[in-house]
Amino acid sequence: MHIPVLIDSLIENLNIREDGIYVDLTLGRGGHAAAILSKLTTGLLIVFDKDEKAIEESKERLLAISKNVIFIWEDFRNFAVELEKRQIYKVDGFIMDLGVSSPQIDQGERGFSYTKNARLDMRMNQNQELDAHHVVNNYNQDLLTKVLQNYGELKNARSLTKAIIDSRPINTTFELVNLIRSSSPAALLRKKNIVKNVFQAIRIEVNDELGALEAFLSLFISYLKQDSQVAIITFHSLEDRIVKMKFKSLLISSKTHLFDPRAQQFSVKTIKPSTSEIQLNKRSKSAKLRILSKNY
């Protein structure tokens, strides 16, 4: 059974108003969306996903809860354009559950999982051209090294890149997994899950995940009402660092000389999963929920 990560903490801290407007930017299987929608009466939930299958698979479930939901098949980096098309200029809350969703991992043919053999793909939006096969088989040494260093945080990125280029063509996930393991030092393999990091790096590149996150963070503030929240769940240090620094910059820019926290325009809270949640849902182990509240 799919369990949404940090669901109780997210719902508790969103302070959901029954007549509010909320935006779920990463629908996935719809667990967070369903919890929000069930608390709305006259309010509205707008859900985004760049993966059309996510919308198809969640639509019936959400509409059974309430008809007050709008489905948008689009990259969340374009949220502002889509909201304004619908004459929505202020919302009560945004939520994001970043990274790859459980269905994308579970569907082996999508090529996201290094434990399932499939053609190298990793596209969240199946209509886009760039896929993992192109990255692995066509990027030059400098570009591929940069991807592995920046998005996989791999110290052996250059030697891995050379091994990949020397072994082309590489067509499947298992071919790539075997190559990574055979070309990495044993000591490094024992210390770090290099395969996981390589797959993460390629996935981030294919879907421009960090670029989309930065695009959202550059725009969302002007869409927040008074007493509203943005809640973002991250799963690795790269995306978490971006969110943390943005929230920190907002805190600094709105800082007052008063000691009363209610005088601050913004406040921030960070929540990690409990031991019991991690035991129930292993995916939550690396999760971190950051919540920014706009107080006025």
From Swiss-Prot:
Main location: cytoplasm
Enzyme Commission no: 2.1.1.199
Reaction catalysis annotation: cytidine(1402) in 16S rRNA + S-adenosyl-L-methionine = N(4)-methylcytidine(1402) in 16S rRNA + S-adenosyl-L-homocysteine + H(+)
Origin superkingdom: Bacteria
Any GO BP annotation: rRNA base methylation
Keywords per UniProt: Cytoplasm, Methyltransferase, rRNA processing, S-adenosyl-L-methionine, Transferase
Binding site residues for S-adenosyl-L-methionine: G30, G31, H32, D49, D97, Q104
Subcellular location(s) per record: Cytoplasm
GO cellular component, one term: cytoplasm
InterPro entries: RsmH, SAM-dep_MeTrfase_MraW_recog, SAM-dependent_MTases_sf
Gene Ontology MF, one: rRNA (cytosine-N4-)-methyltransferase activity
Cross-referenced Gene3D superfamilies: Putative methyltransferase TM0872, insert domain, Vaccinia Virus protein VP39
Broad class of enzyme this protein falls into: transferase
Family note: Belongs to the methyltransferase superfamily. RsmH family.
Function: Specifically methylates the N4 position of cytidine in position 1402 (C1402) of 16S rRNA.
Name of this protein: Ribosomal RNA small subunit methyltransferase H
Source organism (scientific name): Mesomycoplasma conjunctivae (strain ATCC 25834 / NCTC 10147 / HRC/581) (Mycoplasma conjunctivae)
